[in-house]
């Protein structure tokens, strides 16, 4: 199975208008954030948690505190993502409020991402495309009202076919060397087989596009 070296991504994609980073969760185990910083990691998007299925209780990612403390201490800018099982606007709002509680007291300068991938439940939820977008927008507006940036995480296929134009920044997942996604996006997750000093095993590598004046 092929690997994508972080240094190669820097060599290919780093410009004055991009930053190269990663996203992490408990699956990456114990991370050496100083090593990440030395390797040129410019940001890290940390999984805060998920829910135990539909209407389930919230589950804090078991490495969340360790990861956000490590990143804050190493001076690596932090974003957040949450894997949501929301099936209503109310639940999406509750998700956002739970996240805001978990990140209190930590430095979070980058967006909080709504990651919703429950396509197998989609019909059961009886949601229209409009309802789904409305749900994401509700989550993201709570995050923004609290002073954070919000963004929507999704794969290219679903961004093209399901999510109606959301007014929020997009974190595009498309595992390829050059994306042909035509919409606007602020972050691009380009692989899930990344390798970087400080992490044992695979990690997702991302590019952040800085707003050009």
Where do the protein language model's features map onto the residues?
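Aromatic-lined carbohydrate-recognition surfaces of secreted/lumenal glycan-active proteins
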Residues: 143-160
